[in-house]
């Protein structure tokens, strides 16, 4: 995924109301940009961090700038725009970067499924194999004690719990079911379920894996010009 036009940078003052952030532009002026991330953003929104933002050509938008990447004091790059995770996953599948998901004939997004009024992020299908249901989750939480250790989720997620129940049902019904962790933090080298944050999610994930749900974990190469989801890394839910 290339950023066109190129991203601009600013310094973060504060994030607030979940969807907004005040920044200082390179010109010295201050302003407000949109933040497409409703999560906790732990470690991703420290005042003084460098913010890389895109600019929409939609003149009707109240906040035309969108926060895409955080560059931390430690030099880590973090894609905080949660919309990008699904886009990156689709690109990675279509480009053949995720070998475990190759060989399918058709790719659909946001397809209704399950019994809890859900929409699957990605549905793969082919004439010679069962359908493959893929739920994509963005991983940006880096542990502050163990180097390289990432966690998901970064807050209690009832929505994520629902998705695990839906995936479990798909696996039990004979379909292929995938939980794809898209690691969007340059400092994360391995991922684990955040038992200390959402014990219920960790429990449901173990049940899902026993039922046949596969967990894939891919890390993105991140720069202020391009992001590619193309490197498999380890996942643990012990």
From Swiss-Prot:
Transmembrane segments: none
UniProt xrefs under InterPro entries: SfsA (IPR005224), SfsA_C (IPR040452), SfsA_N (IPR041465)
Source domain of life: Bacteria
One MF term in the entry's GO annotations: DNA binding
CDD domains xref list: SfsA-like_bacterial (cd22359)
One Pfam family in the UniProt entry: SfsA_N
Family according to the record: Belongs to the SfsA family.
Cited PANTHER family: SUGAR FERMENTATION STIMULATION PROTEIN A
The protein's name: Sugar fermentation stimulation protein homolog
Originating organism: Vibrio vulnificus (strain CMCP6)
Gene name of the encoded protein: sfsA
């Amino acid at each position: 995924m290339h950023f066109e036009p190129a991203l601009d940078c600013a310094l973060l003052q504060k994030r607030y109301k979940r969807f907004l952030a005040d920044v200082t532009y390179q010109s010295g002026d201050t302003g407000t940009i949109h933040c497409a991330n409703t999560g906790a953003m732990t470690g991703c929104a420290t005042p003084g961090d460098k913010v890389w933002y895109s600019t929409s050509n939609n003149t009707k938008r109240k906040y035309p700038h969108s926060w895409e990447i955080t560059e931390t004091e430690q030099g880590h790059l973090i894609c905080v725009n949660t919309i990008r995770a699904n886009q990156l996953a689709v690109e990675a599948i279509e480009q053949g970067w995720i070998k475990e998901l190759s060989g399918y004939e058709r790719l659909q997004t946001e397809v209704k499924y399950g019994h809890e009024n859900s929409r699957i992020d990605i549905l793969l299908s082919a004439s010679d194999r069962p359908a493959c249901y893929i739920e994509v989750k963005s991983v940006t939480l880096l542990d502050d004690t163990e180097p390289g250790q990432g966690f998901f989720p970064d807050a209690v997620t009832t929505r994520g719990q629902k998705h695990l129940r839906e995936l479990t049902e798909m696996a039990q019904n004979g379909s292929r079911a995938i939980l794809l962790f898209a690691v969007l933090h340059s400092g994360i080298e391995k991922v684990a379920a955040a038992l200390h944050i959402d014990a219920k999610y960790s429990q449901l994930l173990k049940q899902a894996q026993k039922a046949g749900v596969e967990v894939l974990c891919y890390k993105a190469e991140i720069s202020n010009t391009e992001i590619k989801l193309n490197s498999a890394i380890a996942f643990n839910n012990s």
